[in-house]
Amino acid sequence: MANVIKLRKGLDINLKGKAAEELSTVKEPGFYALVPDDFPGVTPKVVVKEQEYVMAGGPLFIDKNHPEVKFVSPVSGVVTSVERGARRKVLNIVVEAAAEQDYEEFGKKDVSKLDGEAVKAALLEA
């Protein structure tokens, strides 16, 4: 069981000195992985295949118990591997990032004209 620390009012840590005011640039990683174990209570069902192109915002896997909940790709690119462990448990889904990012379009909706169910459906779609 993981130790979960809950902060209610925050914590101020008094440190001497001041942080250096410098910015550094980092190279974008070429591979991104989505790990279903990072989401407690989720039983993943993979909806993409290896070597399939996905757009940023496109679903990689869904929750078997709640199929309306989708877990999407952070970048567009090719799914390089779907790693499985014992008893075919999904360990991670690796996406190789494309040079140009393509994003899934969900359209614009006027929230003031939608009812509660339509807003919920739009949020679950995205």
Label the model's feature ranges:
Residues 83-126:
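Buried, small/hydrophobic-residue-enriched core segments of structured protein domains
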